[in-house]
């Protein structure tokens, strides 16, 4: 069973024995238990198991008890802490001093004991010591015997916990590059300093020829391969599309296409094994290959040295990013096409926060209402009336993005793996056509997934960029997938590559300059690619970015919904500027 980090709950208390401490013991510990129950009943790990909380063995009133708590948390694999109290405590004696753990403090809003006073005092201590902490203070006063968690407090506790678990899950893992720089794309010039200092992730790299070596030497699970081919024959090959993109002289024969299917299935198994290892290989005598690279994310270069010669990685990328394969429903992997590691990191953020498979897309085209009318003779309507952005790429878009899963209200959605059903799986596969690759671009052949995302799904488009002299910055745009007139779609889609998956996206507009219209969102995007996650997760992304000291340069989240460490308030009243100043002052966590 996979091991996950845990969240440590620290119940702090007034250390004065002889009446004061004794009167607060039950109340304080009950608050800690309530927080643990809130988190474990609402948040899940990647395999669907509840996020586990560890509570200190006793309340914490003096520094020796803080040390004992820290020791226990180290043993238990804690990756973040939440301190809770209903009273005054001794700030620097009871605070969490671990340099790498994200920290939050909930000070109970009650009149009998000054929990809010401790909250303010300990947050001042965190600021003074350079250990940022999130402050949580309920809007309304509660009675002393009320151990319920108000909705506003619960929202912040869960937002903190989601982001903190993402930080903890990344630490100590690897990003695996298959190959190197793809077609001069800057995002695939992997920066090891960024990964190490900001994420706690090491960089691993294998030449793409390692995939061929394992194929030729039979270093893969042959039983799984047979199972995978049977599954592919049942669910994918029947949906093979017409080879209409290739000129007759460039079309592969039926035998060559069948060989491509076999090749890309083996390729998928081998790429997964390289990422996370496979105990079956140990049984086969391949001890080194069985280990894998401990990769939480990866990227495949593909173009051009591979795709000019061998079947492309589209099938492998799409399927690994999906919440299922021939082994059934499982957690989606994170695999960036073209080894765009910057986009791979954004995909990883989205996956860790949402639990869903991620889309990898070119932010390809802004279609204004006027341009659509000119080329189609028809008008965009409904949510698309102000213009649309075409998200499309040959490779690593999860098949979950078909929108063929449905929520309880019957609406199209993308689900985390623990909510997926066999009916969802079959619907996603049925909606996906596998077209032979365009051999003008992919000379080695292969197959590209094609589908049209259902409209009406809330999604968040995001991107991490590296800027010389500044460092990493994150941008995001919350919005929706949209349905457009099928005749409009047909015309627009045929103007690009109709063998690839398409998603029509509209951002939520507001009065911020980058979001005044749909064109401005496209015009302010920082790179050619974007990662798209199901759900409006902008608030969570902003919280996560602050933990990692990555400023957010563009977003359409309302200011009153932004949750960052309390010390960010000391860097000025404008939230964007204070974020940049705070991130610059504190610097990356692991430097």
Swiss-Prot record:
Swiss-Prot/TrEMBL keywords: Carbohydrate metabolism, Cytoplasm, Fucose metabolism, Isomerase, Manganese, Metal-binding
Matching InterPro entries: Fuc/Ara_isomerase_C (IPR004216), Fuc_iso_dom3_sf (IPR038393), Fuc_isomerase_C (IPR015888), Fucose_iso_dom1_sf (IPR038391), Fucose_iso_N1 (IPR012888), Fucose_isomerase (IPR005763), Fucose_isomerase_dom2_sf (IPR038392), Fucose_isomerase_N/cen_sf (IPR009015)
Subcellular location: Cytoplasm
Gene Ontology cellular component list: cytoplasm
Cofactor(s) it depends on: Mn(2+)
Active site: 338, 362
Catalyzed chemical reaction(s): L-fucose = L-fuculose
Domain of life: Bacteria
EC number: 5.3.1.25
Residues reported to bind Mn(2+): 338, 362, 529
Matches recorded under Pfam families: Fucose_iso_C (PF02952), Fucose_iso_N1 (PF07881), Fucose_iso_N2 (PF07882)
This protein's record includes keyword Isomerase: yes
HAMAP family per the UniProt record, alphabetical: Fucose_iso (MF_01254)
Similarity remark: Belongs to the L-fucose isomerase family.
Protein name according to UniProt: L-fucose isomerase
